[in-house]
């Protein structure tokens, strides 16, 4: 169709020339790496894990310990804050993309499509 598109998926997914976004780049407490493919040039974010501190996991069950260190969110409030989302329940948060990612993608798309 020639219209702009963006496809999101997880690392390892078969996308064409994807860019990656990470919550640590935006000051979020999640390391939710996501890939984005587009027919419009996008610039991904650079991970900032070293200054992020111990990330909060938003998957599985709340209050789980993570074998490699860290934990999943202890409360729904902690999960919402880590993701930058204040309206979702746990079941929605575990499937969500932080809005900061889509804000950045939208900003980049708008600058190209002007």
For each feature predicted by the language model, list its residue ranges.
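Class I S-adenosyl-L-methionine
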Residues: 1-113
């Amino acid at each position: 169709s020639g219209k702009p598109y963006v496809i999101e998926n997880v690392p390892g997914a078969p996308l064409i020339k994807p860019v990656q976004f990470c919550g640590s780049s935006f000051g979020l407490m999640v390391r939710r790496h996501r890939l984005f493919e587009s027919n419009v040039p996008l610039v991904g974010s650079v991970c900032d894990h070293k200054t992020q501190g111990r990330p909060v996991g938003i998957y599985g069950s709340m209050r789980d310990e993570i074998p490699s260190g860290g934990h999943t969110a202890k409360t729904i409030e902690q999960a919402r804050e880590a993701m930058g989302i204040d309206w979702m329940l746990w079941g929605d948060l575990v499937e969500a993309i932080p809005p900061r990612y889509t804000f950045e993608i939208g900003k980049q798309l708008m600058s190209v499509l002007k």
